[in-house]
C-alpha cells in the first residue's frame, strides 16, 4: 500500500468512527474529514507524487461544487414547499377513514396510501414517518385494526414509494459515486426509479404476507410531539394560486431531473429556479429556504464525495476490489455478489444510521469488485446505494427505533416481522437491479 492509500484509509476510518459513536452532529463528520484531507495533504503532499490532484481546499471540498449536490439541495427546498400544500392533509384524512373501517382490506389500502405519499416525499423523509407514527398513536384502539398491526408496516411503508417519481436523494448519491469511480456510464433516472419500484414491490409483498405475524395490542400513548406533528399541516392553508404554483414547481423539477441527459446543465438548475420562485412568492421564508438548502443530509452528501474521491484516486478502492475479486474467484454468480454487498451496506447503515455515508463507502467497493470480475457494475451501483435505505431490522436509529418503542413490540415480535421483510426486500432489489441493468 502506498502512503496515499494509507492516509485515505485513515480518513475513511475517522469518518466511520465519528458517525458510529455520534461524536459530532449528523452531517458534520464528513465535513471534519474534508478538513482532515487538507491537513494531510499539506503535511504529506510531497510524499504522494502519484496523486494527479493534490489534497488541497478545492479537492477536499469539491462536493460543494458538484452538479448533483446542488440539484439535490435545491430540490430539498421544493420538498419543504410541497409539504405545505393540502396533499399531506388529504393523506391524513384518507388514513383516518380507513382506520375507522378496519380489517385486512383497510390495512392493504393504508399501505398503498402511505406508499403514494412516499412517492411525493421520497425515501427517508423523517417528517413523513413521524407524521405516520403520530397518526397511528392518536387513533383509538380497535380490535378490527389495532395500532400494533399498523405501526411497523406503515412506518416502513413511508420509506417505499409506490410510484418512484421522487428518487432525487438516492439517485444523486449513485450519480456522484459513479463520477468519483471514474465511470463514463450514466444512470437514467427512469431506470433508477424502476429498480426502486422492485424494492418497494418486495416490501409490499412481505407487508401483505406479514400482516398475520403482527401482534394485536395497544400502542404507546400520544405525546405532545405526536399531536404537534399530526396537526402541523392543519393551520391556515395557502392561497389556491400559490398551491398550484408549488405543485407545478415540484412536477417541473422532477421532469427536469429525469431529462438530465437531454437538458444537460439546465436540468441541474431548474430545481434552483423553482426554489427561488418559492421564496419570491413567500411559500417559504428565508430561514426555511436556507435550512433546507443546507440541510444536514446535503452537508453529508457534499462532504462524503471527497472522501470517496480519496479512496478512488489513491487506488485503494481498486486495490481492495481486485483483492476481493481474487479471493472470491470467478465462480460467484452476479446475483450472489450483489446480495453480499447489499447485505453489508444495509447492515452498516442500519447500525450507524448514516445511509449516505455508508453507501459512499460500499458502493465504490462493489463497483471495483464487479470490474475486477468483468461484470457490468451498473447494477451494483444502483442496488448497493438503495440497500442503504433497506435495513430496518434493528431498532437502533430513527424509523425502526420509533416504530419499536411506540408500537410497544417485544424484540421477538419486532424481528418476526422485520427480518423476513429484510430478506425479501433485498432479494427483490437484487433481482430488479439485474433485470434493469444486466450484468
Residue ranges, per PLM feature:
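Re-entrant/interfacial helical elements at transmembrane boundaries that shape
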Residues: 92, 125-140, 151-155, 165-182, ...
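Transmembrane helix-bundle signature of multi-pass membrane transporters/permeases
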Residues: 77, 112-116, 131-135, 152-163, ...
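Alpha-helix N-cap/start motif
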Residues: 57, 147, 189, 286, ...
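Juxtamembrane and boundary regions of transmembrane helices in multi-pass small-molecule transporters
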Residues: 7, 143-152, 159-236, 386-439
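Transmembrane alpha-helix interface/packing and boundary motifs in multi-pass membrane proteins
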Residues: 15-24, 114-123, 155-165, 256-262, ...
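Hydrophobic transmembrane alpha-helices of multi-pass small-molecule transporters
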Residues: 1-71, 77, 191-322, 422, ...
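Membrane-embedded alpha-helical segments and adjacent helix-loop junctions characteristic
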Residues: 46-145, 292-373
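Alpha-helical transmembrane segments and their helix-entry boundary regions
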Residues: 26-30, 69, 107, 126, ...
Amino acid at each position: 500500500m502506498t502512503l496515499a492509500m494509507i492516509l485515505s484509509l485513515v480518513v475513511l476510518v475517522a469518518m466511520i468512527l465519528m458517525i458510529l459513536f455520534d461524536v459530532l452532529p449528523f452531517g458534520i463528520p464528513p465535513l471534519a474529514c474534508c478538513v482532515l484531507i487538507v491537513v494531510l495533504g499539506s503535511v504529506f503532499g510531497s510524499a504522494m507524487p502519484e496523486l494527479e490532484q493534490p489534497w488541497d481546499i478545492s479537492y477536499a471540498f469539491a462536493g460543494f461544487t458538484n452538479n448533483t449536490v446542488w440539484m439535490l439541495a435545491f430540490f430539498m427546498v421544493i420538498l419543504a414547499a410541497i409539504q405545505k400544500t393540502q396533499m399531506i392533509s388529504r393523506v391524513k384524512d384518507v388514513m383516518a377513514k380507513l382506520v375507522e373501517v378496519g380489517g385486512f382490506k383497510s390495512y392493504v389500502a393504508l399501505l398503498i396510501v402511505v406508499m403514494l405519499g412516499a412517492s411525493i416525499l421520497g425515501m427517508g423523509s423523517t417528517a413523513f414517518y413521524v407524521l405516520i407514527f403520530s397518526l397511528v398513536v392518536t387513533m383509538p384502539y380497535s380490535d378490527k385494526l389495532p395500532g400494533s398491526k399498523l405501526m411497523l408496516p406503515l412506518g416502513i411503508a413511508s420509506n417505499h414509494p409506490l410510484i418512484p417519481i421522487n428518487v432525487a436523494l438516492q439517485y444523486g448519491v449513485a450519480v456522484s459515486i459513479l463520477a468519483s469511480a471514474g465511470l463514463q456510464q450514466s444512470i437514467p433516472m427512469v431506470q433508477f426509479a424502476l429498480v426502486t419500484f422492485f424494492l418497494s414491490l418486495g416490501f409490499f409483498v412481505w407487508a401483505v404476507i406479514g400482516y398475520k405475524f403482527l401482534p394485536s395490542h395497544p400502542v404507546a400513548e400520544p405525546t405532545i410531539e405526536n399531536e404537534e406533528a399530526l396537526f402541523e399541516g392543519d393551520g391556515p392553508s395557502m392561497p389556491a394560486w400559490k398551491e398550484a404554483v408549488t405543485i407545478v414547481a415540484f412536477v417541473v423539477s422532477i421532469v427536469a431531473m429525469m431529462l438530465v441527459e437531454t437538458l444537460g446543465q439546465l436540468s441541474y438548475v431548474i430545481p434552483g429556479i423553482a426554489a427561488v420562485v418559492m421564496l419570491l412568492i413567500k411559500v417559504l421564508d428565508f430561514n426555511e429556504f436556507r435550512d433546507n438548502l443546507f440541510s444536514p443530509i446535503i452537508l453529508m452528501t457534499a462532504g462524503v464525495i471527497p472522501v470517496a474521491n480519496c479512496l478512488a484516486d489513491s487506488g485503494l478502492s481498486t486495490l481492495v476490489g481486485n483483492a476481493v475479486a481474487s479471493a472470491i474467484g470467478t465462480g460467484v454468480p452476479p446475483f450472489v455478489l450483489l446480495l453480499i454487498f447489499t447485505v453489508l451496506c444495509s447492515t452498516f447503515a442500519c447500525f450507524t444510521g448514516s445511509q449516505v455515508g455508508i453507501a459512499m463507502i460500499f458502493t465504490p467497493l462493489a463497483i471495483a469488485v464487479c470490474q475486477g470480475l468483468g461484470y457490468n457494475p451498473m447494477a451494483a451501483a444502483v442496488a448497493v446505494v438503495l440497500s442503504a435505505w433497506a435495513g430496518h431490522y434493528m431498532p437502533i436509529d430513527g424509523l425502526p427505533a420509533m416504530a419499536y418503542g411506540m408500537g410497544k413490540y417485544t424484540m421477538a415480535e419486532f424481528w418476526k416481522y422485520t427480518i423476513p421483510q429484510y430478506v425479501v426486500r433485498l432479494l427483490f432489489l437484487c433481482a430488479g437491479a439485474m433485470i434493469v441493468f444486466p450484468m
